[in-house]
Each structure stands twice: as structure tokens, then as C-alpha cells.
Amino acid sequence: LAVEQRTPVVHNRVLLAIMLSAWLAAFGMAFVSVAPNRLVSGSGVPLHGLMGAGPHLLWLPAALLMLAAFTRSSRALHATVAVAAALLLAALLWLAGSEARHQASALSPLARVSLGGAFWVLALLCWLAAADAVQRLGLSPGRRTLALSGVLLPALLLLASGALDALSLHKEYANRQEVFNAAGQRHLQIVLS
């Protein structure tokens, strides 16, 4: 008896390309960079080199996103993809903040943990996956904007909770808040005028 072999059918090539790119970034680039202080260059730490069980938080939303590329299109699927991308983005942020706290307690309070290339690529890919899913939902422009704002909500909650305070980016902002705020206001004036 011949066993019929079926090859998986890709239903969302955009999402598949995003997820394959994410795997390359996750395993080929540094997720964070750790330096003993501000004056010394940091050394890159890949995602799989982070301490604790934190990286395991990424598996479920990443697996859902990969599986979604092979699932027939539906509104429920697109909503699930948007939520999974938002959760993956939040998990990436939490993981970076957690590693920063760990390094600050293990090395010294002067230790600096900055976001590496893998973080930025993965964050962008999460945003692209969410934007693609929201676009496929066929929402009106106002609702699409609202849905994409909702994708950022978990990240904003993490920021407000203080979970990202140990990251060097946040430390720099805290040290030079007036300069950052003035520059931000100036940029808004330029954009809105």
C-alpha cells in the first residue's frame, strides 16, 4: 500500500517569511549586549544564552504564529495572529528587562544591558505580523489604528510597571529625561506643522 504524502500548504506566505526571518534573527544575532559599565563595549548574548526559563516564554506565541502560516485564513485566525504577535513582543521586552535585572544583580548596579540586533529585528517582525493580521481582518482605518494600538498595550504596561527600568535605554532616559522630552516635543512640532 502506497502511503500518500501530503506537503503542507502555506496559506500565508507573508507570515511564513516573517517567522523564518525571526528564526534566523533569534539564532543568528545577539539579543542583548552586556557591559560592566557605560565606558566599556558590551558583549553580545544570544537569545538561547539568556539565564533562566525566560526564553521558553517565546515558544508558545512563536509556535502559534508559525502554525498560523499553514492554517486556512479566517477572521478568528487573523485576530489570533495579532494577539500572538502582541504577546510575543511583550515577552521579548519582558525577557530583555529580566536579563537586565539579572545582570545588574549578578555583576553590579553599574552594568549596562542594551538591546541587541536580534531584539530589534524580532520586535519589528512582531509588529509586521500584527500589522499584516490586522490588515487581513478588513477593518476600517479607524478600527485598524485602534487594533494596532492595542498590539502595543502589553508593551506599554510593561514599561509602566517598571519591568524595563534596568535596561540601559531606560537608564539613559531617566538620567537625561529633560533633554529627551524637549527633543520629543520638538520632533512632534515639526511633524504636526
Task: Label the predicted regions.
Residues 1, 192-193:
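Short amphipathic alpha-helical segments with coiled-coil-like heptad repeat character
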Residues 1-186:
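N-terminal, non-cleaved signal-anchor transmembrane helix
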Residues 187-191:
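Loop-to-transmembrane-helix entry motif
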